[in-house]
């Protein structure tokens, strides 16, 4: 999407690793486990605050914008687009990829369905645009190009 839109791309998990990794922690999951939820969220917000001000596409973790400091940092950057996916597809992806550490931690106090519903509701509440991507075939260049074009049309409306 960033290539099609000709924008810089930032992946927040990659930025966490490049800013906070060490000999002991080489992935965002390891950093999350070592730092805990609150400190990890503070790290995310700090990174978002330090990104260059130009237009960019920023990939956030599913729980990032549940934290007010991260939301404030991203809110000033421009349009917030929620790339929405229906719950059954989210469950399918989580089953294939495994649960992120933040979800594992949150599931100590709430069921997964409640956590995901809260996240989706939050995104629907704060997003400037909601763009469904259930139908996008990520292995098809034409599908990705069509989705990118549809998103551009949405942003211009």
Provide a role label for each language-model segment:
Residues 56, 79, 128-129:
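Well-ordered beta-strand positions
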Residues 12, 38-39, 92-97:
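Phosphate/pyrophosphate-binding catalytic cores of soluble transferases and nucleic-acid-acting enzymes
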Residues 14-64, 69-72:
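ATP-dependent small-molecule kinase phosphotransfer cores
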Residues 4, 92, 117-157:
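NTP-dependent small-molecule kinase module
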Residues 24, 76-122:
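A glycine- and Lys/Arg-enriched "phosphate-lid" helix/loop adjacent to the NTP-binding pocket
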